[in-house]
Amino acid sequence: MQQHDICILGAGPGGATAALHLASKGIPCVLIDKAVFPRDKVCGDALSGKVVNELKRIDPGLPALLGKQKEQLPSWGIHFISPAGHKLSVPFKPDYDAAQDVPSGYISKRIDFDNFLIEQVKQRPEITLLEGIGIAKVERDAQGYTLTDKSGEYQVSTRLLIAANGAHSTFARREAGIEQEPAHYCAGLRAYYKNVAGLDKDNFIELHFLKDFLPGYFWIFPLPGGYANVGVGMLSETVSQKKVNLKKEMLRMIESHPEFKQRFAGAELMGDIKGYGLPLGSKKRVISGDNYMLVGDAASLIDPFTGEGISNAMISGRWAATQAELCLQQQNFSADFMRGYDKAVYNRLWKELKLSRRMQQLLDYPWLFNQVASKASKNKALAETISCMFTDLDLRERLKQPSFYLRLLFN
């Protein structure tokens, strides 16, 4: 049996980030994943400015290195299309120059981005990376936890377990008591298409809020090589209540909706349409306990409005590494001491998650969404205000005040 002070279960962006920050502190760990990289992960594939900032925190040179990868596209903004068909184009940076400026966001398939992080992991002697090992049992022991693989031949004992093993983490459910709640869980479908027409020249991602699909949304994200990530998302609660067949609805919109019919006329579906679940951060949860912390999707930290989870996984991975260092320094792995991790994560993310929840709920009022999109599409100053929302939390805070919308509607 191997013994390690710190074991990280799951080598996606959250787990890899935790391992890399530990390595920077000179702290060894073992990082285990059931897959062998590169491996696919069903996702929207968009990397926000927050992801770029977290890469900088790992190593200031990483964003430039990512920018050199042929498997990514720089993205300069988002097109929001309202239920009434108003297009609100929100650049990540006002008055950007795509030829000169450093991109604020990227689009990269998870098979490529996750492997990009794993390549950084492999360069760090402090990290023992174990791929292709499916952990079947996680049991409490006197020191912390013992993990056993499916064959029963591989075992590791650890004083501190960082569970970063995704939306379907058995450990998060059994040990931390995190249940899948339809009101705080999103069902998503993702497909790859080739030759979708009308993609933005600066690779803006598209979020369509279609009248006959609310409160769900339809997305199109451009990818290298003429590909696009195309998908839909809707709260599981709504899917259940309205008995929505997401795949049927997605194909119906692609084949017959006036917004998409011509754009997909010459497009080809590449591979299968795949489903996935998004545990949303619209509710505060206890994400640590005796000898463990939960990171990323295992901690239910996905943004309820945008559906983005990579940046929050990386942020929680960074704070898990900080807490792990304190645990080793103090030789304290108790639940009480571990609460410092919960506090740090929610200090950073809760305002943002709470606000995104409110914005998600605005989709129940399409008339208001239409008014905002219509006004902003004709008002450069207002469009820039909304643009800053993606980087300036104080500004996002203003957007939840009813007076902001009243001024918007009547000025």
Segments predicted by a language model, with ranges:
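N-terminal Rossmann-fold NAD(P) dinucleotide-binding loop
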Residues: 15-16
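A conserved beta-strand/loop capping segment in the N-terminal third of enzymes
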Residues: 56-113
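Predominantly flavin-linked oxidoreductase catalytic cores and closely associated redox partners
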Residues: 120-260
